């Protein structure tokens, strides 16, 4: 059983409704943009201009890459920095139809997997570490798994 989401468009910026952009604080925007392009086939929409960050489209999400920095008027107490690779508090989760095929393809393109795919909790999953230390979960649900 699949779950269908009704939305007419996933444009950025959205003309109606909502589109989600995942913001990653990275050490090197060029390196990170090229990584997501090479490994996962992300489409680089813009590399930014020094004032605006790069935007990428990856499957049904948008990604923003930025080097971060100190507080700004709209976030006066927040500093953005790359993560400590061993203490992560959020991560992307890629749901795939064929985890073994993705594992082989992405590994051949330079993805650094923490482990091979492992069966766990109604799915098979594994994790990738990107150049800045973020982890990305890759998971395939078992055929009998039900959403919702």
PLM segments and residue spans:
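Conserved beta-strand-loop-alpha-helix junction that forms the acyl-donor binding cleft
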Residues: 23-29
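Conserved active-site tyrosine of GNAT-family acetyltransferases
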Residues: 32-37, 106, 133
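Short glycine-/small-residue motifs
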Residues: 137-138
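Short phosphate-engaging motifs
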Residues: 31-32, 98, 102
